[in-house]
Amino acid sequence: MEKDLESHVDDVMSEHGVVGVMCTDDQGLSLIAKGTANPATAGFVQNLAESARKLYPDSEQQPVICLESDACNLLIKSQNKVTIAVHKVPS
């Protein structure tokens, strides 16, 4: 599984504008972090995803969180017990 996850993260990192990717487990532990993604923030990222799910408890789809700043956009989504955070340069 680790090789598959690393391959998927490498694919995301190769997308235009992506400067960092991190995946966490459902306990908030960093599974992998590349580029500008800081593994020390894994717990915060997972907590944001969990809080977003609580805002929409009846939704069948997992919400996507988008945090924007002048320096970076951060997209967060959970699926299948893995939370992914993608750092992108603003377009």
From Swiss-Prot:
- InterPro entries in the record: LAMTOR5
Query: Is the keyword Cytoplasm assigned to this protein?
Result: yes
For the biological process aspect of GO, one term held by this record is:
negative regulation of apoptotic process
The similarity comment for this entry is: Belongs to the LAMTOR5 family.
Q: How does it assemble?
A: Part of the Ragulator complex.
Q: What does this protein do?
A: Regulator of the TOR pathway, a signaling cascade that promotes cell growth in response to growth factors, energy levels, and amino acids. As part of the Ragulator complex, may activate the TOR signaling cascade in response to amino acids.
What name has this protein been given in UniProt? Ragulator complex protein LAMTOR5 homolog
